[in-house]
Design a protein with these regions (language model features):
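Flexible, small-/acidic-enriched active-site or ligand-binding loops
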Residues: 151, 199-228
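A short, Trp-centered hydrophobic/proline-enriched beta-strand micro-motif
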Residues: 132-140
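Internal helix-loop-helix
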Residues: 62-133, 173-180
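Mature N-terminal segment immediately following signal peptide/propeptide cleavage
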Residues: 19-39, 43
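Hydrophobic, small-residue-rich alpha-helical packing segments that form membrane-like cores
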Residues: 146-148, 163, 172
């Protein structure tokens, strides 16, 4: 009697989901896996001990086309959500801090600009963020409110052609190294987001030190003290 043998079990894919992936998705997964093996794993121990992540890694990740890879236009790769998830899974296997840099950059900072930003803001920031030339962060979580917008204490008020921003955010990935922050604040018209470039008067992003986890990730406070934000 003829018998057939089952395909070998892969510990990382025991549900055999690989069969449902496209060739492009497999290629992206395998390319990111190789990147992690050569550019992350040999160094992540030192990054953990030093509690740092080299700035030039963002440029390498940009060359890998994983920054904002699920977005279309403005230099973004425009891949499927599945491909993006596979890339993040491979990055996470190397280190959570590296994956955090990528997912905060793409899913939070870049997506917010891509979805709600003006055309000028998109053209200014997204191409540079896709290459890793510019880094973004996402300021929602607060010391007393957590990530609940309904309890948000950060406020912004109109001042001529711009806004004045006051309040503090906490546990913000990429904050200290960010070239632009997407900061959410309560206004008289409701909660809205603001793009706050590095060097904005009254705005600072001190790093949080002595973490027990996610050490190879820059985690920061965001502090607005009458920060002058353009409209």
């Amino acid at each position: 009697m003829a018998t057939t043998s089952a395909p070998p079990i892969r510990p990382s894919d025991f549900l055999d989901l690989d069969a449902f992936l496209s060739d492009e998705e497999r290629l992206i997964r395998d390319t990111v896996r190789q990147f992690v093996a050569t550019e992350v794993v040999p160094h992540v121990g030192d990054w953990f001990e030093q509690a740092t992540l080299p700035r030039e890694l963002a440029t390498k990740l940009g060359a890998l086309n994983v920054l904002g890879m699920h977005l279309t236009g403005y230099g973004c790769a425009g891949t499927s959500a599945t491909a993006y998830g596979l890339a993040c899974m491979e990055l996470e296997a190397g280190d959570s801090g590296v994956r955090s840099l990528v997912s905060v950059q793409g899913s939070l900072a870049m997506f917010a600009i891509w979805k709600w930003g003006s055309e000028e803001q998109k053209a200014t920031w997204l191409p540079r963020m896709a290459t890793g030339e510019a880094i973004g962060c996402f300021g929602l979580t607060e010391p007393d409110a957590g990530s609940d917008p309904g309890s948000m204490r950060t406020r912004a008020r109109r001042d001529g052609d711009g806004w004045v921003l006051n309040g503090q955010k906490m546990w913000i990935t990429n904050g200290t190294i960010a070239d632009v922050a997407v900061v959410w604040a309560r206004t008289d018209e409701g909660v809205r987001g603001f793009l706050v470039p590095r060097g904005t008067p009254g705005f600072s992003a001190p790093e949080i030190h002595k973490k027990l986890s996610l050490r190879a990730s820059v985690t920061s406070l965001l502090d607005g003290d009458d920060a002058q934000v353009p409209a």
